[in-house]
Amino acid sequence: WFLGVKPLAKFSSNNEIISPTLSTYEISYRNIIQNNLKHYLDIWNLIDQTWHLKPLKYEYMNFWKSNQEQEMFLQKGNALQNEKLSNFLRMLNVSIPHQSFDKINSYALFLIDKKRKLLEVGLNI
C-alpha cells in the first residue's frame, strides 16, 4: 500500500484533516516510519514503471478496507471487526503523511473515485 512512498524532507500534520488529532505517540511513530522509509529507496529505484492507483480522496481507503473486511467475513467467517478494524484503519491513516502519496514518482497515474471508477489517467514521461 505504500509502494513508491519516500521519506519527506519536511512534513507537517497541520494541513491534514485527521480526527481525532494525532497523539504524541502517533507523531513519534510517524517519525520512526519516515526514517524507515529511507531503507526502501534502493528498492524503489529498481522499479522503473510504477502504476499509481490513487483515490480522489484519501479517506476512500477506509471505505474500501471496511468493505473488504465485510466481504472476507461473509466468505471466510473471519475478518477484522469493531475495535480491531478501527485500530487498523487508524494506523493506515496516521502512519504516513497523506502528502507522501502525492509525491510518488510513477510512470502512470490512475485517479479513481469512491466506487473505484476511473476518473483520470496520466503518464509522467
Model-derived segments and spans:
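Conserved NTP phosphate-binding and transfer environment spanning the P-loop NTPase/kinase superfamily
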Residues: F2-I125
